[in-house]
A protein has these predicted regions:
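N-terminal cysteine/histidine-rich coordination modules
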Residues: 1-74
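Residues at structural and domain junctions
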Residues: 6-9, 39-42, 98-101, 123, ...
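Residue-level detector of secondary-structure boundary/capping sites
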Residues: 11-14, 44, 106, 128, ...
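Acidic, Ser/Pro/Thr-rich low-complexity regulatory regions
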Residues: 46, 55, 69, 81, ...
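Short, intrinsically disordered, mixed-charge
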Residues: 58, 120-121, 159
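Extended interfacial segments that mediate partner engagement and assembly in macromolecular machines
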Residues: 66-133
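C-terminal, charged low-complexity interaction regions
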Residues: 134-160
Protein backbone atom coordinates (compact mmCIF):
# COMPACT_ATOMS: atom_id res chain seq x y z
CA UNK A 1 0.00 0.00 0.00
CA UNK A 2 1.28 3.47 -0.85
CA UNK A 3 1.90 5.86 2.01
CA UNK A 4 -1.24 7.87 2.76
CA UNK A 5 -3.39 5.94 0.30
CA UNK A 6 -6.07 3.54 1.50
CA UNK A 7 -6.36 0.03 0.07
CA UNK A 8 -8.00 -0.57 -3.28
CA UNK A 9 -11.32 -2.40 -3.39
CA UNK A 10 -9.51 -5.45 -4.75
CA UNK A 11 -7.43 -5.61 -1.55
CA UNK A 12 -10.59 -6.58 0.37
CA UNK A 13 -11.45 -9.48 -1.97
CA UNK A 14 -9.71 -12.18 0.10
CA UNK A 15 -12.79 -12.38 2.34
CA UNK A 16 -16.44 -11.71 1.56
CA UNK A 17 -19.19 -12.03 4.18
CA UNK A 18 -22.37 -13.09 2.37
CA UNK A 19 -25.83 -14.47 3.09
CA UNK A 20 -25.74 -18.26 2.98
CA UNK A 21 -27.91 -19.45 0.06
CA UNK A 22 -29.24 -22.29 2.23
CA UNK A 23 -29.93 -20.78 5.69
CA UNK A 24 -29.47 -16.98 5.16
CA UNK A 25 -26.98 -16.65 8.04
CA UNK A 26 -23.49 -15.18 7.62
CA UNK A 27 -21.27 -17.29 5.34
CA UNK A 28 -17.70 -16.59 4.24
CA UNK A 29 -16.10 -16.62 0.82
CA UNK A 30 -12.34 -16.93 1.13
CA UNK A 31 -9.21 -18.14 -0.63
CA UNK A 32 -8.32 -21.65 0.56
CA UNK A 33 -4.69 -21.99 1.74
CA UNK A 34 -3.77 -24.47 -0.98
CA UNK A 35 -4.75 -21.91 -3.64
CA UNK A 36 -2.01 -19.58 -2.34
CA UNK A 37 0.85 -22.02 -3.05
CA UNK A 38 3.84 -21.25 -5.24
CA UNK A 39 2.89 -23.92 -7.82
CA UNK A 40 -0.38 -22.16 -8.60
CA UNK A 41 0.31 -18.50 -9.41
CA UNK A 42 -2.00 -16.30 -7.40
CA UNK A 43 -3.45 -13.26 -9.11
CA UNK A 44 -5.43 -11.12 -6.71
CA UNK A 45 -9.10 -11.53 -7.57
CA UNK A 46 -8.53 -14.58 -9.78
CA UNK A 47 -7.70 -17.33 -7.30
CA UNK A 48 -9.83 -20.28 -6.20
CA UNK A 49 -12.55 -19.36 -3.72
CA UNK A 50 -14.53 -21.36 -1.18
CA UNK A 51 -17.99 -20.55 0.18
CA UNK A 52 -18.50 -21.85 3.71
CA UNK A 53 -21.36 -21.45 6.17
CA UNK A 54 -20.42 -22.58 9.68
CA UNK A 55 -24.06 -22.55 10.80
CA UNK A 56 -25.49 -25.07 8.31
CA UNK A 57 -22.28 -26.53 6.81
CA UNK A 58 -22.98 -25.43 3.23
CA UNK A 59 -19.83 -25.37 1.09
CA UNK A 60 -19.07 -24.69 -2.55
CA UNK A 61 -15.80 -24.11 -4.42
CA UNK A 62 -15.05 -22.16 -7.58
CA UNK A 63 -11.77 -22.40 -9.50
CA UNK A 64 -10.25 -20.33 -12.30
CA UNK A 65 -9.01 -22.10 -15.42
CA UNK A 66 -5.78 -21.40 -17.25
CA UNK A 67 -6.64 -19.83 -20.61
CA UNK A 68 -4.85 -20.30 -23.94
CA UNK A 69 -2.81 -17.12 -23.30
CA UNK A 70 -1.57 -18.53 -19.95
CA UNK A 71 -3.71 -16.15 -17.86
CA UNK A 72 -5.99 -17.44 -15.12
CA UNK A 73 -9.69 -16.61 -15.41
CA UNK A 74 -13.09 -17.83 -14.30
CA UNK A 75 -15.50 -19.35 -16.80
CA UNK A 76 -17.94 -16.56 -15.94
CA UNK A 77 -17.63 -12.79 -15.66
CA UNK A 78 -16.98 -11.44 -12.19
CA UNK A 79 -20.03 -9.71 -10.79
CA UNK A 80 -20.45 -5.93 -10.88
CA UNK A 81 -19.26 -4.48 -7.55
CA UNK A 82 -22.05 -1.88 -7.60
CA UNK A 83 -24.73 -4.49 -6.98
CA UNK A 84 -23.90 -5.30 -3.33
CA UNK A 85 -23.06 -8.92 -4.13
CA UNK A 86 -19.81 -10.88 -3.97
CA UNK A 87 -17.77 -11.17 -7.17
CA UNK A 88 -17.64 -14.96 -7.36
CA UNK A 89 -20.99 -16.52 -6.48
CA UNK A 90 -23.21 -13.45 -6.84
CA UNK A 91 -24.60 -13.80 -3.31
CA UNK A 92 -25.93 -10.78 -1.37
CA UNK A 93 -23.36 -9.28 0.98
CA UNK A 94 -24.12 -9.88 4.66
CA UNK A 95 -23.02 -6.40 5.73
CA UNK A 96 -25.56 -4.22 3.96
CA UNK A 97 -28.39 -1.91 4.94
CA UNK A 98 -30.43 0.99 3.62
CA UNK A 99 -29.06 4.46 4.38
CA UNK A 100 -30.28 7.84 3.13
CA UNK A 101 -32.29 6.15 0.37
CA UNK A 102 -29.30 4.13 -0.87
CA UNK A 103 -27.87 0.68 -0.30
CA UNK A 104 -24.80 0.76 1.98
CA UNK A 105 -22.64 -2.38 1.73
CA UNK A 106 -19.25 -3.74 2.77
CA UNK A 107 -17.31 -6.86 1.77
CA UNK A 108 -16.10 -7.60 5.31
CA UNK A 109 -15.38 -5.94 8.66
CA UNK A 110 -11.96 -4.64 7.58
CA UNK A 111 -13.66 -2.86 4.67
CA UNK A 112 -16.35 -1.52 7.04
CA UNK A 113 -13.81 -0.21 9.59
CA UNK A 114 -11.67 1.47 6.92
CA UNK A 115 -14.67 3.25 5.41
CA UNK A 116 -15.92 4.21 8.88
CA UNK A 117 -12.55 5.81 9.66
CA UNK A 118 -12.63 7.66 6.34
CA UNK A 119 -16.17 8.98 6.95
CA UNK A 120 -15.19 10.17 10.46
CA UNK A 121 -12.27 12.24 9.12
CA UNK A 122 -12.95 15.96 8.76
CA UNK A 123 -9.90 16.46 6.52
CA UNK A 124 -9.59 13.78 3.87
CA UNK A 125 -6.40 12.64 2.11
CA UNK A 126 -5.23 13.99 -1.23
CA UNK A 127 -2.32 12.99 -3.47
CA UNK A 128 -2.72 9.45 -4.82
CA UNK A 129 -6.16 9.28 -3.25
CA UNK A 130 -7.75 8.24 -6.57
CA UNK A 131 -6.17 4.78 -6.19
CA UNK A 132 -8.03 4.01 -2.96
CA UNK A 133 -11.38 2.33 -2.32
CA UNK A 134 -12.49 5.54 -0.59
CA UNK A 135 -12.17 7.49 -3.84
CA UNK A 136 -14.79 5.19 -5.38
CA UNK A 137 -17.41 5.86 -2.72
CA UNK A 138 -20.64 7.39 -4.00
CA UNK A 139 -20.87 11.16 -3.56
CA UNK A 140 -23.76 10.96 -1.08
CA UNK A 141 -21.60 8.98 1.38
CA UNK A 142 -18.92 11.68 1.36
CA UNK A 143 -21.26 14.60 2.04
CA UNK A 144 -21.03 16.03 5.55
CA UNK A 145 -24.84 16.31 5.82
CA UNK A 146 -25.09 12.49 5.68
CA UNK A 147 -22.06 11.75 7.90
CA UNK A 148 -24.17 11.10 11.03
CA UNK A 149 -26.62 8.81 9.21
CA UNK A 150 -23.83 6.83 7.54
CA UNK A 151 -21.99 6.38 10.85
CA UNK A 152 -25.23 5.21 12.55
CA UNK A 153 -25.80 2.65 9.79
CA UNK A 154 -22.19 1.45 10.12
CA UNK A 155 -22.59 1.11 13.90
CA UNK A 156 -25.73 -0.97 13.32
CA UNK A 157 -23.84 -3.25 10.91
CA UNK A 158 -20.95 -3.68 13.37
CA UNK A 159 -23.43 -5.32 15.78
CA UNK A 160 -24.76 -7.55 12.98
Amino acid sequence: MLDGVGPTLLAYSDLFLVQCPKCRSCARIFTPNKAKGKDNPRYLGHESKRLLCVKCGYTKDIHPKQRWDNHWAFSHELYDVKQGVDWYFGLPLYLQTQCCGHKLWFFNYEHLFDIENYIKERVRPSGLYYLSAESRLPKWMKLSKYRGDVLKAITKLKCH
